[in-house]
Amino acid sequence: MLSGESEMDEERMDLGIEFETTEEIPVPERLIDQVIGQDHAVEVIKTAAKQRRHVLLIGEPGTGKSMLGQAMAELLPTEELEDILVFPNPEDENMPRIKTVPAGQGRKIVEEYRRKAKEQEGVRFYLLFFVFFIVAMAVFLSHGDPNTLLLGVFVILVALMVTANMRFKTQAMVPKLLVDNSGRKRAPFVDATGAHAGALLGDVRHDPFQCFSGEEVIIVEKGKDRKVVKLREFVEDALKEPSGEGMDGDIKVTYKDLRGEDVRILTKDGFVKLLYVNKREGKQKLRKIVNLDKDYWLAVTPDHKVFTSEGLKEAGEITEKDEIIRVPLVILDGPKIASTYGEDGKFDDYIRWKKYYEKTGNGYKRAAKELNIKESTLRWWTQGAKPNSLKMIEELEKLNLLPLTSEDSRLEKVAIILGALFSDGNIDRNFNTLSFISSERKAIERFVETLKELFGEFNYEIRDNHESLGKSILFRTWDRRIIRFFVALGAPVGNKTKVKLELPWWIKLKPSLFLAFMDGLYSGDGSVPRFARYEEGIKFNGTFEIAQLTDDVEKKLPFFEEIAWYLSFFGIKAKVRVDKTGDKYKVRLIFSQSIDNVLNFLEFIPISLSPAKREKFLREVESYLAAVPESSLAGRIEELREHFNRIKKGERRSFIETWEVVNVTYNVTTETGNLLANGLFVKNSGGLGTPAHLRVEPGMIHRAHKGVLFIDEIATLSLKMQQSLLTAMQEKKFPITGQSELSSGAMVRTEPVPCDFILVAAGNLDTIEKMHPALRSRIRGYGYEVYMRTTMPDTPENRRKLVQFVAQEVKKDGRIPHFTRDAVEEIVREAQRRAGRKGHLTLRLRDLGGVVRAAGDIAVRKGKKYVTREDVLEALKLAKPLEKQLADWYIERKKEYQVIRVEGGEIGRVNGLAIIGEQSGIVLPIEAIVAPAASKEEGKIIVTGKLGEIAKEAVLNVSAIIKRYKGEDISKYDIHVQFLQTYEGVEGDSASISVATAVISALEEIPVRQDVAMTGSLSVRGEVLPVGGVTPKIEAAIEAGIKTVIIPKSNEKDVFLSPDKRKKIKIIPVERIDEVLEVALVESEKKRELIKRVRESLPLWMEETPSGETLHEHKGGATLPLEESKA
């Protein structure tokens, strides 16, 4: 047995530093000092930063390549940083000019040009005024002569055209800041891993096809007037007097030029000027996306770009992992409350006076003159009176309900109440009472509970409603805070049969708000379908709808049509129908009664405000599903039941994608090329009249100017992109042009744009083969190539570095507690185990960091102040790699079906050991049989199982051993070797001794012990050579219930097992194949004869001991006597 093998030191481990917790460990400020174990790479990076050399980092994932790239950026000087501007070119508009200035100057230059443009606006105004004045004087002096009047009109028109053109030219002359380095405290670090051509090399925008559905909400400012409008309504209104129209293939485009008007649209950075609006008519496809986890939805053409947390992405590429940038919007503020009192002006006056009074302290008389407000009003305010609306605003502010933003977590509760008010709720015209009627007392109670969560305790009454035809319960409150709050948020006021219903704009900002609104609306007005059997099959009967009466169809129809459109995002089919009922109209939102639509509805609309209605609905669906086996849907019963069970558990899909073909789309073009639609930050068209230089977008190579460009897996870039990258590295400049041949951006090509970056490329050994030879030559000739180490010596100094690593990970994560000393010891032991070599520590620190974070999460869950050893041990069990989980499942499954056997002996069957991934072992059963050769010329070794090239060659090498000891021609045999159920694949030669043992057992018909497993490579001389992953292989054998493991003598010091595992296994190191057979074969006379023959056949030096025993000495290794008792 392996004596003293890889023993874990139970005594206090020398960590190179004394501490109680990692709180005491200082974490270096500079990233370069945080790099662990890669001393050679650190020195190279420091030299490369000083000399501005490129670096190629080759190594396994998780060894710190990207960290070294970021560290280099810290080492570069910031004094050399520059801003890059792009200017229009009067001589050739498709070749914008490029200018570089010291960092921080770019913004000043752009602001200066904008100031000049505004001055030009003033000149334009005075010029027009002068022309009007001259024309007016001429007409006056000519006593109204018609010819003079006609000439004057002509002069005015010409002046308007000239000044409008002058305005556009002054705006077009404002440069665009491509790269802004103002305020930077370190050189740029740009990670271009996986970037496409446009993102890496720069692009020129052209997106006239990128359009919206038109249902989106935008915020528009015209002069001092600011309002929330639907995009479709805004564009249609602007196109009442279009500037022009044309055809784009089969699509008719109508547009309006608004450059001469003072219209602005809200974007992420405030309001920006609107340039154009356009409408496109013709068949077009919209991609509709709902992400409930990240709470956003959008409906745009597939190539429409949106801003995600990872940069710009086309809508067609958006996945459930993408987070679209959202900007919080103010939904409710003081002025909106004031408007419910009709005190908009008075509220504004009070705020103006209050600021004036706090600043000057002047009395009301003087203030009245300076502010143009009535003296009597100011006298009352000076004495402490306030507008009624202000008192209400102050009360709502105490409840933190003002200002109310789109990110407020209470909005869903507000939305569900609002939905109920749109159904069976009411606010009277005088704003005196708010009421809600339901036949279900529980619904009333939930309505009240929700209001209390928002407003606290308030006065109300609940009583039987004797005015209704059926039995119902009435809730009523007179609380003016509640009434004014919901009126300001868009609740209908007065008799709903006479009121025009409009879906409040803020409800459309997020899918969660819309679903909450629908919950309240359906809980009040919705009807539940009934299950019924018919001769032709089963179906839902009765009504499944929301219906309301009105005296004017247009007061309800658009409201329900809009709801139906938004429901389609979730795959819920609904249509609107209007029926005449006496002197009124009944507008009905009718839902499809197919089982799929019913389940979709229940999945997303929980009907939480009306528990009885939900229970009734679920019972009807259960009755339907119970009858499905007898219907045409019998083949889908499991699918439908599974969907229904998820609904009952409250589960729902988080990412829903649908497509819709529409005939009209809408868009707007702003000065900055972006806007907020439904609160989401999106790009918009830059193609219609936008100057070429404003459509230029810098690439990552330009943003990395004077900094570091990091590209991991650089070989994944196309050869064309690698060639372009090489050109940029050589020239230190690279022009920007449109990357798409179909785009008008392809006609634009800027002057060369500076891109003097240091390239830090990374990858694995395969990267070298796939890299463009010239690119690698450039790096090698003008920089360094570094191989990243995967282990470092296990010394106290390096253990101290791992202590620092743990402290760094805790600080970097920011959400886990610090580690105690014994917990750090366990992390170091895990680093020893993962190194796979005695006396070494792993440098795959990303994986080790995963253990640190998992242990920290466990400590947080337990409410601990510090992470302890027990937390780390639990983390190692909980956070197993995927390969380890597969290996455990593999072993469990194989044992269950007796594919892995751990008792008795069998001929030709051996338990080999293999590795999945990097750190996970599996037991690999191997079987061999010998049969007469099928070919008269020669026998074959036939191997089955999913083997790699190296594994196949290793099997063939076994035949050399067999031929030598057998002493006869084995060509008359076919030897079949099967790797049982190796669907996961096998590569490497570590199964060589297992194959040799199985084949020899089959040839000699000697059973192999099934409680023995083995791993090791085999040379043609019979030597057992070292292999990798010995520790995880032994652990797999232990988990499978095997008692003895054979390993190469060379790997003896690489075994690292915990004490509890050491007790469960006997480990035997060997140097030769005869030693393997000695242990593995079942004891018999045939075995003794076989081993003697094998030993005699091995090309090894022999000698006799004084006692007469024959020894085989193998290069100074262990010696095994030939004795009968050896087993």
Swiss-Prot record:
It is found in: Cell membrane. It is a multi-pass membrane protein. PROSITE patterns: INTEIN_C_TER, INTEIN_ENDONUCLEASE, INTEIN_N_TER, LON_PROTEOLYTIC. GO terms for molecular function: ATP binding; ATP-dependent peptidase activity; endonuclease activity; serine-type endopeptidase activity. One of its GO terms (biological process) is intein-mediated protein splicing. Keywords: ATP-binding, Autocatalytic cleavage, Cell membrane, Endonuclease, Hydrolase, Intron homing, Membrane, Nuclease, Nucleotide-binding, Protease, Protein splicing, Serine protease, Transmembrane, Transmembrane helix. GO terms for cellular component: plasma membrane. ATP-dependent serine protease that mediates the selective degradation of mutant and abnormal proteins as well as certain short-lived regulatory proteins. Degrades polypeptides processively. This is Archaeal Lon protease. It comes from Pyrococcus horikoshii (strain ATCC 700860 / DSM 12428 / JCM 9974 / NBRC 100139 / OT-3).
